[in-house]
């Protein structure tokens, strides 16, 4: 039997989740860390930069999907591994900062897979059963959060709208992968899933690589950018899987009502 009234502790957890999920600006975080405006960095890239970024994002998500469909279910839970995952991603970022845009095709699939495993560990710590393909694809979904084209700040156009849109894509992909695996990556449900996530992930990658490609950034700056990058997705993952955990306790409708009653920074909610 589900609980109907949220405890004070769970309300606070939901507020923290909303702060992360509705204020996902990776560009602002990178700017604050390095003092280099992302908009200015984007203007310094060559005219053809979007093609390799798009290809790299697509390749990274395709690689991550194979991990999600297979070995991700063996990921251990807990958040203690966050520091290790950060260290590994930071190391790949040092190479990206030293070699710039040409290194992206090599660096991004590696760092994305590491981030996916970190996301999965957070998911399991929040009670997700990673033997379920839907839970594993929910890990992949984190890469699509915060990269919503044309997003406005209304609550209905934020996190829950993104989840609703992804849910339609995920159901078809989960059914196909559950029945046939990933033997045919060109199958329409799989293609739609990869394209959906890659498009949104690519927006965030563009902001990352724009700053990373600035000549003065170098290896140290590239490492710092990757630290900010994985920390961003770890925060989004914790928010996402906190909401899902609370939905399992109180039901989706109750959690959604509380979530939408809060301001975007989570500072106010329904009085209890």
Labelled PLM ranges:
Residues 1-92, 117-272:
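Terminal, membrane-proximal amphipathic helices
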Residues 88-106, 113, 117:
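Glycine-rich active-site/cofactor-binding loop and its immediate structural neighborhood
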Residues 107-111, 222-225:
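Short hydrophobic alpha-helical segments that form membrane-spanning helices or hydrophobic packing faces
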Residues 110-113, 233:
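Bulky hydrophobic/aromatic packing residues
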